[in-house]
Amino acid sequence: CGSDMHAYHGKDERRVPPLILGHEVSGTIQNGKFKGKVVVLNPLISCRKCHYCKNQREHLCPERSMIGMSKPLKREGGLAEFVSIPNTNIYEIPSSLDVKEAALAEPVAVSLHAVLLGEQTLKQPIKDCRILIQGAGAIGLICGLILSKEKKCKKIVMSDPNKLRLKECSKYLDAKFVEPKNQEIDENGFDMVIDSVGLEVSRQQAIHVVAPGGSIIHIGLTEPSGNFNFRKLTIQEITLIGTYCYTNKDFKETMNILTNKKLGSLKWIEYRDLKKGPEAFKEIHNGKCVAPKIILIP
């Protein structure tokens, strides 16, 4: 996950070493209520008692924690042979779903939540919108696949400075693929912008290219602050909405999406041995990784 890379770079205050990273996890339960079951884990743990939890907004629980994080509560993550998690966060996998593909449930839930939240802000049917997706990583690609295959959107542009990633995504997503400075990314040219990057420069581009009355859906967490054109946001009635994680309902829906192959081919996932994890981090850091998602197998 991109957030694991933030930790790798020492830029995530919620992930402080020593810590086992990893929150996109599937496998076989070794003990307890679900012993022997093949499952996927919802890594987001909430109190289940507060106002937010009782109103199906568990991702906003003030006591939430996540495996693979050290704050607010240290919970070791899934980049290991074993991981511990409450029974309430365990979902059995249908026999028709490959256990390795099931590990994609968490980023699919993140992407689904972002698309649904963004759709609520629009003033026209989402299928008719001009949409820019910033970032050709897993979240950007999955958002694009949901928009294209589930929401029937036809006017999608994906931007990323990594040409290798763009080329790989072009094999699976029906969209235009451009670098961020491409002329096709026009001022006021998009009804919705999905920022899966979260840099100051991506936010500046998002507000520049979003059309009057349009929406910016902010997912990325790379840089927490920076300059932003709030004047345009105000006088052009732009909706800027942050989106974090997903609800339990979103997570359950991802099981339906994955089981029924609604994202199409998942050959863009690369599988590697867990022992080769350090090499994967280095490749991503150096911009040499083609795959939008690498899954490590213990």
Name each model-derived stretch.
Residues 11-54, 94-96:
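Glycine-rich beta-strand-centered segment in the early N-terminal region that forms part
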Residues 40, 194, 217:
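N-terminal Rossmann-like NAD(P) cofactor-binding module of classical short-chain dehydrogenase/reductase
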Residues 49-134:
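NAD(P)H dinucleotide-binding glycine-rich loop of Rossmann-like/cofactor-binding domains
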Residues 97-180:
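Mid-domain Rossmann-like dinucleotide-binding core that forms the NAD(H)/NADP(H) cofactor-binding site
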Residues 176-182, 271-276:
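Short acidic-hydrophobic, aromatic-tinged amphipathic segments that line or gate anion-handling sites
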Residues 184-193:
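A short acidic, Gly/Pro-enriched loop at the edge of an enzyme's catalytic core
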Residues 200-260, 297-298:
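Glycine-rich phosphate-binding loop and adjacent beta-alpha segment
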Residues 204, 248, 252-298:
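C-terminal hydrophobic helical "lid"/dimerization subdomain
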